[in-house]
Amino acid sequence: DADIAVWAPPVNAQN
């Protein structure tokens, strides 16, 4: 879900 990672920290982008 790279699209959601925009608002989430890159470190937890995989979550």
Swiss-Prot record:
Q: What does its pH dependence look like?
A: Optimum pH is 6-7.
Molecular function as annotated in GO: RNA nuclease activity; tRNA-specific ribonuclease activity
In the Enzyme Commission scheme, what number(s) does this protein have?
A: 3.1.-.-
The EC category is hydrolase
Q: Which UniProt keywords apply?
A: Hydrolase, Nuclease
**Thermal dependence, as annotated:** Optimum temperature is 45 degrees Celsius. Activity decreases sharply above 50 degrees Celsius and below 40 degrees Celsius.
Presence of keyword Hydrolase:
yes
Keyword Metal-binding part of the UniProt annotation: no
Could you name the domain of life of the organism this protein comes from? Eukaryota
> Which additional comment does the entry carry?
Inhibits HIV-1 reverse transcriptase with an IC(50) of 300 nM.
Q: What does this protein do?
A: Has ribonuclease activity towards yeast tRNA and polyuracil, and decreasing ribonuclease activity towards polyadenine, polycytosine and polyguanine respectively. Lacks antifungal activity against M.arachidicola and P.piricola. Inhibits HIV-1 reverse transcriptase.
What does the subunit section of this Swiss-Prot or TrEMBL entry state?
Answer: Monomer.
Instruction: Name it.
Output: Ribonuclease
What is the organism of origin for this protein? Thelephora ganbajun (Ganba fungus)
Q: What is the lineage of its organism?
A: Eukaryota, Fungi, Dikarya, Basidiomycota, Agaricomycotina
